[in-house]
Regions:
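The feature captures the beta-strand-to-loop junction immediately N-terminal to the Walker
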Residues: 22-24
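ABC ATPase "signature
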Residues: 216-217
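Helix N-cap at the start of a conserved alpha-helix in ABC-type nucleotide-binding domains
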Residues: 168-170
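Catalytic Walker B motif of ABC-type/P-loop ATPase nucleotide-binding domains
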Residues: 157-160
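Short coil-to-helix segment of the ABC ATPase nucleotide-binding domain corresponding to the Q-loop/switch region
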Residues: 91-99
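Conserved signature/switch motifs of ABC ATPase nucleotide-binding domains
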Residues: 131-134, 152, 184
Length: 240
């Protein structure tokens, strides 16, 4: 039996927008992000990133992805931050940041190191450059993960519930970093349970349930005047 995890998704993200994706667990939010950067492949539809075609459906109904190298290059336009920090435990913080730009993008090592130090300053962790991940708090590790994604110079940042595995007191420091990125007009798609962030920082909120976008709109409309019954029930539960 075929299970459609996502269906009927129609989503436009403009440059500089911050999209908050909310909804109950199992509604397809994380899968949506994974489809955007090709961690999951779609079986119908079109994905266009920064004006470039990543995937399209042919006249025969078959999904065709851009060729290998081109596909990877387009996918690299998106930085991804996961629930779990996924830092390399055997590398220092600085080494974690420079690994992919040097090895994957073949950029100049000395220049990448300078840029990485600037990014660590940006996320408030300059003094942790030579520290190993195990010596950091969860909030610090997640901020390193954000800096590591930014080191690849993405056009778009994808966040998959970046604070869900953090204690409440550590959540604030990660959200603060994300808020600063939003103020710098970084294009962001954020799957989150943090309704305050969605309400205050997002330019658009998308509510998903059962693999579909049930409602989308400006934060003030979604939170103060929700039309969809599922959204109304969801907000009653999470905003108690």
């Amino acid at each position: 039996q075929e299970l459609n995890v996502l269906q009927g998704i129609d989503l436009d993200v403009e440059e500089g927008e911050v999209i908050a994706v909310i909804g109950p667990s199992g509604s397809g939010k994380s899968t949506l992000l994974r489809c955007l950067n090709k961690l999951e492949t779609i079986n119908r539809g079109t994905i266009i990133i920064d004006g470039e075609l990543l995937a399209d459906t042919s006249s025969t109904g078959e999904v065709v992805y851009a060729p290998g190298d081109e596909s990877r290059r387009i996918a690299c336009k998106m930085g991804m931050v996961f629930q779990q920090f996924n830092l390399f435990p055997h590398m220092t913080v600085l080494q974690n940041l420079i690994e992919a730009p040097v090895q994957v993008q073949k950029r100049d090592r000395a220049q990448v190191i300078e840029e990485a130090k600037i990014l660590l300053g940006k996320v408030g962790l300059s003094e942790k450059a030579d520290v190993y991940p195990r010596k950091l708090s969860g909030g610090q590790q997640q901020r390193v993960a954000i800096a590591r994604a930014l080191a690849m110079k993405p056009s778009i940042m994808l966040f998959d519930e970046p604070t869900s595995s953090l204690d409440p007191e550590l959540t604030g420091e990660v959200l603060r970093t994300m808020r600063e990125l939003a103020e710098e007009k970084m294009t962001m798609v954020v799957v989150t349970h943090e309704m305050g962030f969605a309400r205050e920082v997002a330019t658009k909120v998308i509510f998903m349930a059962d693999g579909r976008v049930q409602e989308q709109g400006r934060p003030e409309d979604i939170f103060t005047n929700p039309k969809n019954e599922r959204l109304q029930a969801f907000l009653q539960t999470v905003l108690k």
